């Protein structure tokens, strides 16, 4: 099965950041979240990225957890003023350094891409957000915003390349 077959089988739709998604769960319980207002407790989606596509830098007002399901390992780039660029490999445990789960703290700029040769042509992950995802809390990065995150420090070539790739 290839990525396009999975997109069709799971009923995935194009996501504004890149890739494809479908919400699979939205908690019916709600609460007032600090600074966010009324939100459900949690949400979950399927997210598929095909080889050659990118999930562009974006951030959420809630924590997000990525759970690897199948396909190629995927590199998630996280960018903060405090830590600069950090790269995380999410995938199956059979290849060594990849981990099957990654927590992305709220308000962290992040994006993702399949690097190197692709054995499957896609990555399928689940993303759980708490408090629950709401497009009002989703911010797609403009290049000047991302560059401002690292403007207070020397920017190495790797960071430059990732910023250019994911904006």
Label every model-predicted segment.
Residues 105:
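Histidine-centered phosphotransfer motif of kinases
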């Amino acid at each position: 099965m290839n990525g396009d077959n999975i997109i069709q089988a799971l009923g995935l739709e194009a996501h504004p950041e890149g890739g494809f998604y479908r919400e699979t769960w939205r908690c019916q319980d709600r609460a007032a979240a600090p600074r966010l207002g009324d939100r459900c407790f949690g949400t979950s989606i399927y997210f598929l990225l095909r080889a050659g596509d990118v999930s562009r830098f974006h951030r959420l007002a809630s924590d997000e957890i990525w759970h690897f399901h199948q396909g190629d390992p995927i590199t998630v780039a996280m960018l903060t003023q405090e830590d600069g660029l950090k790269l995380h490999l999410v995938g199956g445990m059979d290849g060594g350094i990849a981990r099957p789960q990654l927590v992305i703290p709220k308000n962290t700029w992040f994006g993702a891409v399949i690097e190197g040769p692709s054995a499957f042509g896609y990555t399928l992950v689940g993303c759980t957000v708490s408090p629950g995802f709401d497009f009002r809390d989703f911010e797609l990065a403009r290049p000047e915003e991302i560059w401002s995150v690292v403007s207070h420090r020397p920017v190495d070539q790797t960071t430059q390349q990732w910023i250019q790739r994911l904006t």
